[in-house]
Amino acid sequence: MRRYSTGILKRGYAVFAAILFAAAICAPSAAGERALSVSLSGNARAPIGWIEFCSQHFEDCAAAPNNGRDVALTANAWKDLVRVNQWVNNNIKPMTDAEHWGAVEKWSYPDDGYGDCEDYVLLKRKMLMQAGWPRHTLLITVVREMSGDGHAVLTVKTDKGDFILDNQNEEILLWSQTSYRYVKRQSQSDPNVWVSLGDPRPALATATSR
């Protein structure tokens, strides 16, 4: 098992401190609250990869009762996010579904150490749930890159905003700080219900390829 990078952890804690400082000095406004969380704009179709994944992993797809609350972003919670994001990004090697499975689209846990973006997301979601994070705060999200290509990231719902865990970025950012246009994601009420996202921004050329 690869050890966590001290540099990444220190940068992660610096970001966390900056988030808390900004929250302390900035009075929330309606516009500011909208910027912290991407808006919803209706229902969407669940990706076929998710549907097929759930046919084999019922326990990871079932809806569970929840209080609808976002996670309090404490120092320990932030540490969980930084470590899980880094561990998965460092220990899973990128491989397309065509190379891996001979299929156009297949979502699976990267048990053999290889996977594409959805597989990174599935493992991060699983590890955080095993660490005690509520399922309804960990939402698989489909985004669009500047090239027009689709990509998947994990949205983490916290009381400080929607943060993104991404296999293309070691840093954990607010959704509005990333380069992507947000298309759809799982509903907080049921992981099998997907919702469209009201993100009018074009994708920007700031992501690092991986």
What kind of region is each of these model predictions?
Residues 2-16:
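Bacterial N-terminal signal peptides that target proteins for export
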Residues 21-30:
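C-terminal segment of classical bacterial N-terminal signal peptides
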Residues 2-4, 29-210:
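A structural boundary/capping signal
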Residues 15-19, 47-49:
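Short hydrophobic "helix-edge" motifs at membrane interfaces and signal-peptide entry regions
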